[in-house]
From Swiss-Prot:
Disulfide topology: none
Membrane spanning residue stretches: none
Protein name in UniProt: Keratin-associated protein 5-11
Intervals holding Sequence repeats: 35-38, 41-44, 47-50, 87-90, 121-124, 146-149
Subunit structure: Interacts with hair keratins.
Length: 156
C-alpha cells in the first residue's frame, strides 16, 4: 500500500505517515518510491524537490527533499513560486524574470534582467552592458545582449 497517497512502495525507512506529516498526493510532483522515504518527505508539493537535507527530520533520499518545518537554514526549494510559504526558503519564480524574482532570501537568487534569468546562480550575476561584480559567484561576460555564466572575467 502506498505512503500518504504515493503510488510507489514504501521501504522500512518510510516510518509511516502520521498527523502533521502532510500529504504526498498527486501534487507531490509524481510520487514514486523516492518519495516514500523518512516521514520528513511526506510534505506538500513544495518540499518534494531536489536536495533539502534537514538534520531535524532525518535524511531524505532520491530526488525528493524534505523541507516543511525544517527551518530556513537549508535550501532546496527548486522551482516553487515566491508565494509558497512551505518552502525552506522563498524561491525565484519559474515563470520568468520580474521585479519579484530576485529575493535576497532565495536559496539561489536569480539574475533578473530584461534578457537574462539564470536560476542556477548561487549569487546574482552581472548582466548589463558593461559590468563586473566581484560579488558574483562567476562574474559574467557581459555584453549588450549576452550573459555567459561560465566566464571568469568580464569582457567589455
Amino acid at each position: 500500500m502506498g505512503c500518504c497517497g504515493c503510488s510507489g512502495g514504501c521501504g522500512s525507512g518510510c516510518g509511516g505517515c502520521g498527523s502533521g506529516s502532510g500529504g504526498c498526493g498527486s501534487g507531490c510532483g509524481g510520487c514514486g518510491s523516492s518519495c516514500c522515504v523518512p516521514i520528513c518527505c511526506c510534505k506538500p508539493v513544495c518540499c518534494c524537490v531536489p536536495a533539502c537535507s534537514c538534520s531535524s527530520c532525518g535524511s531524505c533520499g532520491g530526488s525528493k527533499g524534505g523541507c516543511g518545518s525544517c527551518g530556513s537554514s537549508k535550501g532546496g526549494c527548486g522551482s516553487c513560486g515566491c508565494s509558497q510559504s512551505n518552502c525552506c526558503k522563498p524561491c525565484c519564480s519559474s515563470s520568468g524574470c520580474g521585479s519579484f524574482c530576485c529575493q535576497s532570501s532565495c536559496s539561489k537568487p536569480c539574475c533578473c534582467q530584461s534578457s537574462c534569468c539564470q536560476s542556477s546562480c548561487c549569487k546574482p550575476c552581472c548582466c548589463q552592458s558593461s559590468c563586473c561584480q566581484s560579488s558574483c559567484f562567476k562574474p559574467c561576460c557581459c555584453q549588450s545582449s549576452c550573459c555567459v555564466p561560465v566566464c571568469c572575467q568580464c569582457k567589455i
